[in-house]
Amino acid sequence: MNSQAELRRRLGTQATFLVVAALLASFPLRAEAQESGTTESTETAVVENNLSAPRATERARSVPIRIGYFRAHDARGLNVFEAPKDEGMPYDGFSLQWGAAFTQQFQSIEHENEASPNVVNNVDLNSLIGIGKGFNNADANLFMDAQLARGIRVALTSYLSSRHHSETWVKDGYLLIDGSPWENESLDNLMKYLTLRLGHFEINYGDMHFRRTDNGQALFNPLVGNLLMDAFTTEIGGEVYARTRGFLAMAAVTGGEVRGQVIKPEQRSPSVIGKLGYDGQIAPDLRVRLTGSVYKTSKSISNTLYTGSRAGSRYYYVVEAPNATEAAQAWSGDVRPGFGKKVTAWVVNPFIKYRGLELFGNVEEAKGRSATEVSDRTWKHYAGEAVYRFFGNQLYVAGRYNVAKGQLQGISPEVTVNRIQPGGGWFLTQNLMAKAEYVQQKYEDFPVTDIRSKAKFEGAVIEAVVSF
Protein backbone atom coordinates (compact mmCIF):
# COMPACT_ATOMS: atom_id res chain seq x y z
CA MET A 1 0.00 0.00 0.00
CA ASN A 2 2.78 2.40 0.88
CA SER A 3 4.53 1.81 -2.45
CA GLN A 4 1.25 2.33 -4.32
CA ALA A 5 0.60 5.58 -2.45
CA GLU A 6 4.13 6.75 -3.19
CA LEU A 7 3.65 5.95 -6.88
CA ARG A 8 0.39 7.88 -6.96
CA ARG A 9 2.06 10.89 -5.31
CA ARG A 10 4.88 10.88 -7.86
CA LEU A 11 2.57 10.48 -10.82
CA GLY A 12 0.46 13.29 -9.44
CA THR A 13 3.53 15.51 -9.03
CA GLN A 14 4.68 14.85 -12.59
CA ALA A 15 1.21 15.47 -13.99
CA THR A 16 1.01 18.73 -12.03
CA PHE A 17 4.35 19.81 -13.44
CA LEU A 18 3.29 19.11 -17.02
CA VAL A 19 0.09 21.11 -16.55
CA VAL A 20 1.98 24.01 -14.95
CA ALA A 21 4.64 23.93 -17.68
CA ALA A 22 2.00 24.05 -20.40
CA LEU A 23 0.27 26.98 -18.73
CA LEU A 24 3.52 28.87 -18.21
CA ALA A 25 4.62 28.35 -21.79
CA SER A 26 1.49 30.14 -23.01
CA PHE A 27 1.21 32.73 -20.23
CA PRO A 28 1.57 36.35 -21.46
CA LEU A 29 4.14 37.78 -19.08
CA ARG A 30 4.08 41.40 -20.22
CA ALA A 31 3.75 43.57 -23.30
CA GLU A 32 6.33 43.10 -26.06
CA ALA A 33 7.31 46.79 -26.17
CA GLN A 34 10.97 45.90 -25.67
CA GLU A 35 11.01 42.85 -27.94
CA SER A 36 13.17 44.26 -30.70
CA GLY A 37 15.96 45.35 -28.34
CA THR A 38 15.70 42.16 -26.31
CA THR A 39 15.85 39.96 -29.36
CA GLU A 40 19.06 41.54 -30.60
CA SER A 41 21.00 40.89 -27.39
CA THR A 42 19.51 37.42 -27.00
CA GLU A 43 20.42 36.43 -30.55
CA THR A 44 24.04 37.45 -29.97
CA ALA A 45 24.24 35.38 -26.78
CA VAL A 46 22.82 32.32 -28.50
CA VAL A 47 25.16 32.50 -31.48
CA GLU A 48 28.25 32.93 -29.26
CA ASN A 49 27.41 30.51 -26.45
CA ASN A 50 25.06 27.95 -27.88
CA LEU A 51 23.42 27.02 -31.14
CA SER A 52 24.24 28.10 -34.66
CA ALA A 53 22.31 30.75 -36.58
CA PRO A 54 19.88 31.11 -38.27
CA ARG A 55 17.77 28.46 -36.51
CA ALA A 56 19.03 29.65 -33.12
CA THR A 57 17.98 33.20 -34.02
CA GLU A 58 14.44 32.00 -34.65
CA ARG A 59 14.40 30.22 -31.30
CA ALA A 60 15.73 33.30 -29.51
CA ARG A 61 12.85 35.44 -30.82
CA SER A 62 10.34 32.98 -29.37
CA VAL A 63 11.88 33.04 -25.87
CA PRO A 64 12.75 36.65 -24.98
CA ILE A 65 14.51 37.33 -21.68
CA ARG A 66 12.78 40.08 -19.72
CA ILE A 67 14.97 40.11 -16.61
CA GLY A 68 18.21 42.08 -16.31
CA TYR A 69 21.53 40.70 -15.00
CA PHE A 70 20.19 37.22 -15.63
CA ARG A 71 21.58 33.78 -16.48
CA ALA A 72 19.13 32.12 -18.84
CA HIS A 73 17.68 28.76 -17.83
CA ASP A 74 18.08 27.41 -21.37
CA ALA A 75 21.21 26.85 -23.48
CA ARG A 76 21.98 30.57 -23.49
CA GLY A 77 23.17 29.97 -19.91
CA LEU A 78 25.93 27.55 -20.95
CA ASN A 79 29.37 28.56 -19.63
CA VAL A 80 27.86 31.44 -17.67
CA PHE A 81 29.08 31.44 -14.09
CA GLU A 82 28.09 34.34 -11.83
CA ALA A 83 25.03 36.22 -13.10
CA PRO A 84 26.42 38.66 -15.69
CA LYS A 85 27.20 42.25 -14.73
CA ASP A 86 25.23 43.33 -17.78
CA GLU A 87 21.69 44.63 -17.72
CA GLY A 88 20.98 42.88 -21.00
CA MET A 89 17.96 45.07 -21.70
CA PRO A 90 16.68 48.50 -20.61
CA TYR A 91 14.50 48.60 -17.51
CA ASP A 92 10.87 49.17 -18.47
CA GLY A 93 8.98 48.65 -15.24
CA PHE A 94 8.06 45.57 -13.22
CA SER A 95 8.48 42.30 -15.09
CA LEU A 96 7.72 38.71 -14.13
CA GLN A 97 9.20 35.65 -15.82
CA TRP A 98 8.38 32.01 -15.14
CA GLY A 99 10.41 29.00 -16.16
CA ALA A 100 10.79 25.30 -15.46
CA ALA A 101 13.17 22.38 -15.94
CA PHE A 102 12.35 18.70 -16.22
CA THR A 103 14.52 15.58 -16.55
CA GLN A 104 14.03 11.87 -17.01
CA GLN A 105 16.73 9.18 -16.92
CA PHE A 106 17.02 5.57 -18.01
CA GLN A 107 19.62 3.64 -16.00
CA SER A 108 21.43 0.42 -16.84
CA ILE A 109 24.09 -0.12 -14.16
CA GLU A 110 25.56 -3.19 -12.48
CA HIS A 111 27.44 -3.28 -9.17
CA GLU A 112 29.57 -5.66 -7.10
CA ASN A 113 31.62 -5.81 -3.89
CA GLU A 114 33.74 -8.17 -1.77
CA ALA A 115 32.68 -7.25 1.79
CA SER A 116 32.49 -9.86 4.54
CA PRO A 117 28.95 -10.88 5.57
CA ASN A 118 27.09 -8.81 8.17
CA VAL A 119 23.95 -10.80 8.93
CA VAL A 120 21.18 -9.08 10.91
CA ASN A 121 17.76 -10.75 11.21
CA ASN A 122 18.75 -13.23 8.50
CA VAL A 123 19.71 -10.43 6.08
CA ASP A 124 23.31 -9.81 4.99
CA LEU A 125 23.58 -6.02 5.21
CA ASN A 126 26.93 -6.12 3.39
CA SER A 127 25.42 -7.71 0.31
CA LEU A 128 24.14 -5.44 -2.47
CA ILE A 129 20.56 -4.76 -3.41
CA GLY A 130 19.55 -6.18 -6.76
CA ILE A 131 19.32 -3.55 -9.51
CA GLY A 132 18.62 -3.71 -13.23
CA LYS A 133 17.54 -1.63 -16.20
CA GLY A 134 14.77 0.92 -15.78
CA PHE A 135 13.59 4.51 -15.53
CA ASN A 136 14.48 6.71 -12.57
CA ASN A 137 12.11 9.08 -10.82
CA ALA A 138 11.47 12.22 -12.88
CA ASP A 139 12.88 15.49 -11.49
CA ALA A 140 11.38 18.95 -11.98
CA ASN A 141 12.18 22.56 -10.98
CA LEU A 142 10.02 25.68 -11.12
CA PHE A 143 11.67 29.11 -11.55
CA MET A 144 10.17 32.49 -10.75
CA ASP A 145 12.19 35.63 -11.56
CA ALA A 146 10.93 39.17 -11.13
CA GLN A 147 12.43 42.56 -11.98
CA LEU A 148 11.31 44.75 -9.06
CA ALA A 149 13.13 47.95 -9.97
CA ARG A 150 16.05 49.12 -12.07
CA GLY A 151 18.96 46.85 -11.15
CA ILE A 152 16.96 44.90 -8.54
CA ARG A 153 15.50 41.46 -9.11
CA VAL A 154 14.28 38.53 -7.04
CA ALA A 155 14.69 34.82 -7.80
CA LEU A 156 12.82 31.83 -6.39
CA THR A 157 13.46 28.17 -7.25
CA SER A 158 11.23 25.30 -6.13
CA TYR A 159 11.71 21.56 -6.52
CA LEU A 160 8.46 20.04 -7.79
CA SER A 161 9.80 16.49 -7.64
CA SER A 162 13.14 14.97 -6.66
CA ARG A 163 14.66 11.66 -5.65
CA HIS A 164 14.84 12.70 -1.99
CA HIS A 165 11.45 14.45 -1.83
CA SER A 166 8.38 13.58 -3.88
CA GLU A 167 6.51 16.67 -2.65
CA THR A 168 7.01 20.28 -3.78
CA TRP A 169 9.32 22.43 -1.67
CA VAL A 170 11.45 25.56 -2.00
CA LYS A 171 15.15 25.30 -2.86
CA ASP A 172 16.12 28.98 -2.45
CA GLY A 173 15.00 32.57 -2.82
CA TYR A 174 17.06 35.76 -2.83
CA LEU A 175 17.32 39.42 -3.81
CA LEU A 176 20.01 40.46 -6.32
CA ILE A 177 21.02 44.13 -6.49
CA ASP A 178 23.09 45.24 -9.49
CA GLY A 179 22.02 48.86 -9.75
CA SER A 180 20.56 51.76 -7.84
CA PRO A 181 16.79 52.34 -8.17
CA TRP A 182 17.39 56.03 -7.43
CA GLU A 183 18.78 58.68 -9.74
CA ASN A 184 22.09 59.26 -8.00
CA GLU A 185 25.31 59.64 -9.94
CA SER A 186 27.56 58.43 -7.11
CA LEU A 187 25.48 55.31 -6.52
CA ASP A 188 25.25 54.65 -10.24
CA ASN A 189 29.04 54.82 -10.59
CA LEU A 190 29.53 52.52 -7.57
CA MET A 191 27.01 49.94 -8.78
CA LYS A 192 28.82 49.65 -12.10
CA TYR A 193 31.26 47.45 -10.19
CA LEU A 194 29.31 46.08 -7.19
CA THR A 195 26.67 43.36 -6.83
CA LEU A 196 24.80 42.46 -3.62
CA ARG A 197 22.91 39.24 -2.99
CA LEU A 198 20.73 38.75 0.11
CA GLY A 199 18.52 35.88 1.17
CA HIS A 200 18.61 32.09 1.18
CA PHE A 201 20.78 31.16 -1.79
CA GLU A 202 23.12 28.64 -3.38
CA ILE A 203 26.51 29.66 -1.99
CA ASN A 204 29.23 30.67 -4.44
CA TYR A 205 31.98 28.28 -3.35
CA GLY A 206 33.94 27.10 -6.38
CA ASP A 207 32.78 27.05 -9.99
CA MET A 208 31.51 23.49 -10.33
CA HIS A 209 28.14 24.39 -8.83
CA PHE A 210 27.47 26.49 -11.96
CA ARG A 211 28.00 23.40 -14.17
CA ARG A 212 26.43 20.69 -12.01
CA THR A 213 22.99 19.16 -12.31
CA ASP A 214 20.56 20.84 -9.91
CA ASN A 215 17.68 18.38 -9.65
CA GLY A 216 15.54 19.07 -12.73
CA GLN A 217 17.99 21.63 -14.16
CA ALA A 218 20.50 19.40 -15.96
CA LEU A 219 21.10 21.48 -19.10
CA PHE A 220 24.46 22.95 -17.99
CA ASN A 221 26.05 19.61 -17.02
CA PRO A 222 27.56 17.92 -20.11
CA LEU A 223 27.33 14.56 -18.31
CA VAL A 224 24.69 12.93 -16.11
CA GLY A 225 26.31 12.64 -12.67
CA ASN A 226 27.91 15.37 -10.55
CA LEU A 227 31.29 15.24 -8.78
CA LEU A 228 32.09 12.67 -6.08
CA MET A 229 32.37 15.36 -3.39
CA ASP A 230 29.46 17.56 -4.41
CA ALA A 231 30.22 20.98 -2.88
CA PHE A 232 26.73 22.41 -3.09
CA THR A 233 24.42 23.83 -0.45
CA THR A 234 22.06 26.72 0.27
CA GLU A 235 22.52 29.02 3.26
CA ILE A 236 21.02 32.26 4.58
CA GLY A 237 23.19 35.37 4.41
CA GLY A 238 24.65 37.99 2.13
CA GLU A 239 27.29 38.33 -0.60
CA VAL A 240 29.17 41.33 -1.95
CA TYR A 241 30.82 41.20 -5.39
CA ALA A 242 33.28 43.59 -7.01
CA ARG A 243 33.95 43.12 -10.74
CA THR A 244 35.99 45.10 -13.22
CA ARG A 245 37.84 44.26 -16.46
CA GLY A 246 37.36 40.54 -15.94
CA PHE A 247 38.57 40.47 -12.33
CA LEU A 248 36.23 39.18 -9.63
CA ALA A 249 36.25 39.42 -5.83
CA MET A 250 33.49 38.08 -3.58
CA ALA A 251 32.99 37.96 0.19
CA ALA A 252 30.05 36.37 1.98
CA VAL A 253 28.80 35.68 5.49
CA THR A 254 26.04 33.13 6.08
CA GLY A 255 24.37 31.31 8.94
CA GLY A 256 26.45 28.22 8.23
CA GLU A 257 23.53 25.81 7.89
CA VAL A 258 20.91 24.94 5.32
CA ARG A 259 18.08 26.42 7.41
CA GLY A 260 17.79 29.17 9.98
CA GLN A 261 17.95 28.37 13.69
CA VAL A 262 17.95 30.46 16.88
CA ILE A 263 18.39 27.72 19.49
CA LYS A 264 21.76 26.53 20.88
CA PRO A 265 23.68 29.58 19.62
CA GLU A 266 26.79 28.48 21.53
CA GLN A 267 27.07 25.51 19.15
CA ARG A 268 26.84 27.58 15.98
CA SER A 269 28.96 30.16 14.18
CA PRO A 270 28.66 31.94 10.83
CA SER A 271 30.29 30.63 7.68
CA VAL A 272 32.74 32.90 5.89
CA ILE A 273 33.17 32.47 2.13
CA GLY A 274 35.61 34.19 -0.22
CA LYS A 275 36.36 34.05 -3.92
CA LEU A 276 38.93 35.67 -6.22
CA GLY A 277 39.25 35.19 -9.94
CA TYR A 278 39.69 36.37 -13.48
CA ASP A 279 37.49 35.65 -16.50
CA GLY A 280 38.52 37.19 -19.82
CA GLN A 281 38.36 36.81 -23.58
CA ILE A 282 42.11 36.64 -24.27
CA ALA A 283 41.58 36.35 -28.03
CA PRO A 284 38.52 36.12 -30.29
CA ASP A 285 38.52 32.31 -29.99
CA LEU A 286 40.09 31.96 -26.52
CA ARG A 287 38.44 32.50 -23.15
CA VAL A 288 40.32 31.87 -19.88
CA ARG A 289 38.87 31.79 -16.38
CA LEU A 290 40.64 30.99 -13.12
CA THR A 291 39.10 31.25 -9.65
CA GLY A 292 40.00 30.29 -6.11
CA SER A 293 37.45 29.91 -3.31
CA VAL A 294 37.57 29.31 0.43
CA TYR A 295 34.86 28.25 2.89
CA LYS A 296 35.16 28.15 6.69
CA THR A 297 32.79 27.22 9.52
CA SER A 298 34.26 27.02 13.04
CA LYS A 299 31.31 25.25 14.64
CA SER A 300 27.93 24.01 13.54
CA ILE A 301 25.24 21.55 14.54
CA SER A 302 24.67 20.46 10.95
CA ASN A 303 26.91 21.95 8.27
CA THR A 304 26.07 20.71 4.78
CA LEU A 305 28.84 21.93 2.46
CA TYR A 306 29.21 18.40 1.04
CA THR A 307 25.75 17.10 1.95
CA GLY A 308 23.57 19.99 0.80
CA SER A 309 22.15 18.41 -2.36
CA ARG A 310 18.64 17.70 -1.17
CA ALA A 311 17.75 16.28 -4.58
CA GLY A 312 19.99 13.19 -4.44
CA SER A 313 22.42 11.61 -6.91
CA ARG A 314 21.69 10.36 -10.43
CA TYR A 315 22.89 6.79 -9.75
CA TYR A 316 20.02 4.96 -8.08
CA TYR A 317 20.75 2.22 -5.49
CA VAL A 318 24.40 1.68 -6.48
CA VAL A 319 26.49 -0.03 -3.75
CA GLU A 320 23.55 -0.03 -1.34
CA ALA A 321 22.32 -2.69 1.10
CA PRO A 322 19.22 -4.85 0.51
CA ASN A 323 17.11 -2.65 2.83
CA ALA A 324 17.94 0.58 0.97
CA THR A 325 15.16 2.96 -0.09
CA GLU A 326 15.15 5.57 -2.83
CA ALA A 327 14.80 8.53 -0.44
CA ALA A 328 16.81 7.39 2.60
CA GLN A 329 19.80 6.38 0.45
CA ALA A 330 19.32 9.25 -2.02
CA TRP A 331 23.05 9.98 -2.41
CA SER A 332 24.23 6.64 -3.81
CA GLY A 333 27.73 6.89 -5.24
CA ASP A 334 28.59 10.22 -3.58
CA VAL A 335 31.50 10.72 -1.18
CA ARG A 336 30.21 12.45 1.96
CA PRO A 337 33.15 13.18 4.29
CA GLY A 338 31.00 13.87 7.36
CA PHE A 339 32.12 17.41 8.29
CA GLY A 340 28.93 18.39 10.09
CA LYS A 341 30.61 20.11 13.07
CA LYS A 342 33.36 22.18 11.42
CA VAL A 343 34.96 22.49 8.01
CA THR A 344 37.60 24.53 6.23
CA ALA A 345 37.80 24.01 2.47
CA TRP A 346 39.46 25.59 -0.54
CA VAL A 347 39.14 24.93 -4.25
CA VAL A 348 40.81 26.18 -7.44
CA ASN A 349 38.91 25.97 -10.73
CA PRO A 350 40.54 26.64 -14.13
CA PHE A 351 38.36 26.94 -17.23
CA ILE A 352 39.59 27.30 -20.82
CA LYS A 353 37.40 27.62 -23.90
CA TYR A 354 39.02 27.55 -27.33
CA ARG A 355 36.50 27.47 -30.15
CA GLY A 356 34.50 24.28 -29.57
CA LEU A 357 36.84 22.88 -26.91
CA GLU A 358 36.18 23.40 -23.19
CA LEU A 359 38.50 22.32 -20.37
CA PHE A 360 37.47 22.53 -16.72
CA GLY A 361 39.34 21.48 -13.58
CA ASN A 362 38.72 21.08 -9.85
CA VAL A 363 41.57 20.99 -7.30
CA GLU A 364 40.17 20.89 -3.77
CA GLU A 365 41.07 20.14 -0.17
CA ALA A 366 38.75 20.04 2.83
CA LYS A 367 39.47 19.53 6.52
CA GLY A 368 36.93 19.09 9.30
CA ARG A 369 35.14 16.73 11.67
CA SER A 370 31.78 15.62 13.01
CA ALA A 371 30.33 16.45 16.44
CA THR A 372 31.52 13.15 17.94
CA GLU A 373 35.17 13.55 16.87
CA VAL A 374 38.00 15.40 18.60
CA SER A 375 40.47 15.70 15.69
CA ASP A 376 40.13 16.85 12.10
CA ARG A 377 40.27 14.65 9.03
CA THR A 378 41.38 15.72 5.53
CA TRP A 379 40.00 14.96 2.08
CA LYS A 380 41.57 15.78 -1.27
CA HIS A 381 39.40 16.00 -4.35
CA TYR A 382 40.41 16.34 -8.02
CA ALA A 383 38.48 16.41 -11.28
CA GLY A 384 39.28 17.08 -14.92
CA GLU A 385 36.65 17.57 -17.60
CA ALA A 386 36.83 18.05 -21.37
CA VAL A 387 33.99 18.95 -23.74
CA TYR A 388 34.12 19.39 -27.50
CA ARG A 389 31.11 20.99 -29.21
CA PHE A 390 30.56 20.75 -32.96
CA PHE A 391 27.90 20.98 -35.66
CA GLY A 392 27.04 24.52 -34.64
CA ASN A 393 27.42 23.57 -30.95
CA GLN A 394 24.37 21.34 -31.22
CA LEU A 395 26.36 18.12 -30.68
CA TYR A 396 29.17 17.45 -28.21
CA VAL A 397 31.34 14.73 -26.72
CA ALA A 398 32.59 14.93 -23.14
CA GLY A 399 34.67 13.11 -20.58
CA ARG A 400 35.46 13.49 -16.89
CA TYR A 401 37.90 11.86 -14.48
CA ASN A 402 37.24 12.35 -10.76
CA VAL A 403 39.04 11.07 -7.66
CA ALA A 404 38.54 11.68 -3.94
CA LYS A 405 40.94 10.48 -1.24
CA GLY A 406 40.75 10.87 2.53
CA GLN A 407 39.73 9.43 5.87
CA LEU A 408 36.14 8.66 6.80
CA GLN A 409 34.95 8.67 10.39
CA GLY A 410 35.60 5.31 12.03
CA ILE A 411 37.89 4.08 9.23
CA SER A 412 41.58 4.42 10.09
CA PRO A 413 43.35 4.13 6.73
CA GLU A 414 42.73 6.56 3.93
CA VAL A 415 40.30 5.37 1.29
CA THR A 416 40.08 6.29 -2.38
CA VAL A 417 37.11 6.56 -4.72
CA ASN A 418 37.59 7.20 -8.43
CA ARG A 419 35.14 7.66 -11.27
CA ILE A 420 35.34 7.98 -15.07
CA GLN A 421 32.49 9.37 -17.18
CA PRO A 422 32.73 9.47 -20.98
CA GLY A 423 29.61 10.67 -22.77
CA GLY A 424 27.99 13.09 -25.15
CA GLY A 425 24.83 14.97 -25.97
CA TRP A 426 22.60 16.65 -28.52
CA PHE A 427 20.81 19.99 -28.23
CA LEU A 428 17.67 19.47 -30.29
CA THR A 429 16.70 23.08 -29.50
CA GLN A 430 18.01 25.61 -26.98
CA ASN A 431 15.41 24.25 -24.51
CA LEU A 432 15.64 20.52 -25.21
CA MET A 433 18.61 18.17 -25.00
CA ALA A 434 19.43 14.47 -24.76
CA LYS A 435 22.65 13.09 -23.31
CA ALA A 436 24.20 9.80 -22.32
CA GLU A 437 27.19 8.63 -20.34
CA TYR A 438 29.03 5.50 -19.40
CA VAL A 439 30.11 5.55 -15.76
CA GLN A 440 32.58 3.40 -13.87
CA GLN A 441 33.31 3.94 -10.18
CA LYS A 442 35.70 2.00 -7.95
CA TYR A 443 36.18 1.97 -4.16
CA GLU A 444 39.69 1.24 -2.91
CA ASP A 445 41.21 0.52 0.53
CA PHE A 446 37.89 0.18 2.37
CA PRO A 447 38.00 -2.42 5.19
CA VAL A 448 36.47 -5.81 4.44
CA THR A 449 33.76 -5.13 7.03
CA ASP A 450 32.50 -2.15 5.01
CA ILE A 451 29.91 -2.67 2.25
CA ARG A 452 32.15 -0.60 -0.05
CA SER A 453 35.09 -3.04 0.25
CA LYS A 454 36.41 -3.54 -3.31
CA ALA A 455 33.09 -2.25 -4.58
CA LYS A 456 32.51 -1.20 -8.15
CA PHE A 457 29.63 -0.08 -10.31
CA GLU A 458 29.50 0.58 -14.03
CA GLY A 459 26.99 1.03 -16.80
CA ALA A 460 25.12 3.58 -18.86
CA VAL A 461 22.65 6.34 -18.06
CA ILE A 462 20.58 8.21 -20.65
CA GLU A 463 18.94 11.51 -19.74
CA ALA A 464 16.46 13.84 -21.45
CA VAL A 465 16.26 17.48 -20.33
CA VAL A 466 13.74 20.26 -20.93
CA SER A 467 14.51 23.75 -19.56
CA PHE A 468 12.99 27.15 -20.28
Give the label of every model feature segment:
Residues 2-3, 7, 17, 27-105, ...:
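N-terminal periplasmic/intermembrane-space "pro-region" immediately following the signal or transit peptide
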Residues 118:
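Histidine- and aromatic-enriched segments that form or immediately flank copper-ligand environments
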